[in-house]
């Protein structure tokens, strides 16, 4: 809008070429990282807008700087749209990330040193749910709950028993690698039974919740956090929701001046655009297709005895696959697939025996390929290509066949139409 592509290329060819290479990579790769997606041109336009110039510490109507009338309109649009999407009374759209949203939620609910229960990383939790290397594990006394070792599903009886023993002040629900439906009402029952608050991190499933395809945590959680990317298809950022006015005040204070200064007004604008897209009926169709494509890929793996899907299948946008019968570990699988232009990540599985740098599994997500237009047929083909690659890792002729098949798919489904 202000600085066009030709100007950019002429001014900084090195940076322009790097960005162009990334655009080429995204166009020519099949993206299966579950936390990634493809945003609209409108989202990118908003994020690259002149709003990046404006500082606006505070909140709409209560800023510390002048000249904020326009950014007040922008932020209010984002807030009201977020509230409408999720049926929440209060929304804070300023968090720069999901991790910062979680940090602010903790600050609003508990004190340093308090006992908290969160899902352990290998069972599908997130670093900010109490991992020792995270601020969460270093600030609070986290006690991890796990999935059932046999079913690899959440065991609410076991979680209740554990909660009765450790008496947490807060229970954190939500996951970054759990492929089944989460019953948030049961988590609230457990929290109430032990006098704890409930916080839900729905970062991965927020788009499915928004589309009505996964139960919403908002009626049950004291605070709900999410990212605005992943299945929501917005810019990288965070969002906090609550129905409690007093908690809303604490959340606002925790974000600013607690852990952030001025909001990124251009990112808030991009969030507002993406929220408008979520409110469009077409988004529900997109989210439904994400689940269909995830199931289609999982079904291919379920038919091959050399692979094992954690928990036996998927009901959302992702699933985990134990690859150790075919290759040494998840890291090896990730690297092999990189060579044929299929991008995903190694991932720990429940009761993991390998280090987080190797892992027994890989995580596969359908959000980005669905955004490109892949359907169930293409998704099954992708799963077949993954299996073909991992089972023929030493056969360059087969790997070249896979590369050609990947190129056919990416050429047929462009990242962006010109």
UniProtKB/Swiss-Prot annotation:
PROSITE patterns: SHMT. Pathway: One-carbon metabolism; tetrahydrofolate interconversion; Amino-acid biosynthesis; glycine biosynthesis; glycine from L-serine: step 1/1. One of its GO terms (cellular component) is cytosol. One of its GO terms (molecular function) is pyridoxal phosphate binding. Its EC number is 2.1.2.1. Keywords: Amino-acid biosynthesis, Cytoplasm, One-carbon metabolism, Pyridoxal phosphate, Transferase. InterPro entries: PyrdxlP-dep_Trfase (IPR015424), PyrdxlP-dep_Trfase_major (IPR015421), PyrdxlP-dep_Trfase_small (IPR015422), Ser_HO-MeTrfase (IPR001085), Ser_HO-MeTrfase-like (IPR049943), Ser_HO-MeTrfase_PLP_BS (IPR019798), SHMT-like_dom (IPR039429). It catalyses: (6R)-5,10-methylene-5,6,7,8-tetrahydrofolate + glycine + H2O = (6S)-5,6,7,8-tetrahydrofolate + L-serine. The record marks 229 as: Plays an important role in substrate specificity. Its cofactor is pyridoxal 5'-phosphate. It comes from the Bacteria. The keyword Transferase applies. PANTHER family: SERINE HYDROXYMETHYLTRANSFERASE (PTHR11680), SERINE HYDROXYMETHYLTRANSFERASE 1 (PTHR11680:SF35). Homodimer. NCBIfam families: PRK00011.1. Belongs to the SHMT family. Catalyzes the reversible interconversion of serine and glycine with tetrahydrofolate (THF) serving as the one-carbon carrier. This reaction serves as the major source of one-carbon groups required for the biosynthesis of purines, thymidylate, methionine, and other important biomolecules. Also exhibits THF-independent aldolase activity toward beta-hydroxyamino acids, producing glycine and aldehydes, via a retro-aldol mechanism. This is Serine hydroxymethyltransferase. It comes from Streptococcus pneumoniae serotype 19F (strain G54).
């Amino acid at each position: 809008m202000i600085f066009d592509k030709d100007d950019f290329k002429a001014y900084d060819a090195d940076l322009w070429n790097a960005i162009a290479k990334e655009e080429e990579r995204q166009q020519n790769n099949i993206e299966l990282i579950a936390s990634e997606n493809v945003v609209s041109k409108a989202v990118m336009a908003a994020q690259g807008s002149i709003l990046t110039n404006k500082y606006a510490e505070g909140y709409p109507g209560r800023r510390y700087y002048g000249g904020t009338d326009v950014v007040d309109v922008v932020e209010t649009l984002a807030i009201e749209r977020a509230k409408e999407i999720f049926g929440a009374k209060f929304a804070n759209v300023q968090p720069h990330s999901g991790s910062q949203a979680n940090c602010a939620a903790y600050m609003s609910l508990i004190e340093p040193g308090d006992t908290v229960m969160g899902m352990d990383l290998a069972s599908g939790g997130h670093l900010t749910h109490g991992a020792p290397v995270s601020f969460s594990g270093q600030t609070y006394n986290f006690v991890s709950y796990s999935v059932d070792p046999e079913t690899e599903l959440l065991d609410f009886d076991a979680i209740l028993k554990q909660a009765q023993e450790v008496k947490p002040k807060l229970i954190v629900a939500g996951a970054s690698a759990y492929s089944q439906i989460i019953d948030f009402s049961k988590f609230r029952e457990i929290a109430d039974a032990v006098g704890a608050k409930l916080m839900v991190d729905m970062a991965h499933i927020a788009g499915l919740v928004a589309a009505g395809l996964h139960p919403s945590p908002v009626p049950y959680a004291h605070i709900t956090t999410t990212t605005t990317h992943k299945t929501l298809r917005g810019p990288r950022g965070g969002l906090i929701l609550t129905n409690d006015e007093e908690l809303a005040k604490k959340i606002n204070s925790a974000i600013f001046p607690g852990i952030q200064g001025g909001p990124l007004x251009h990112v808030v604008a991009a969030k507002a655009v993406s929220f408008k897209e979520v409110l469009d009926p077409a988004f529900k169709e997109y989210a439904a297709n994400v689940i269909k494509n995830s199931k289609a890929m999982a079904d291919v793996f379920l038919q091959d005895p050399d692979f094992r899907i954690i928990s036996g299948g998927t009901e959302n946008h992702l699933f985990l696959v134990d690859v150790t019968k075919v290759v040494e570990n998840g890291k090896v699988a990730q690297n092999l697939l990189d060579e044929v232009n299929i991008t995903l990540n190694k991932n720990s599985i429940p009761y993991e025996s390998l280090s987080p740098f190797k892992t027994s599994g890989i995580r596969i997500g359908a959000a980005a390929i669905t955004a490109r237009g892949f359907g169930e047929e293409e998704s099954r083909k992708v799963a077949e290509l993954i299996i073909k690659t991992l089972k023929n890792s030493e056969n360059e002729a087969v790997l070249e066949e896979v590369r050609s098949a990947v190129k056919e798919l990416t050429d047929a489904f462009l990242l962006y139409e010109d």
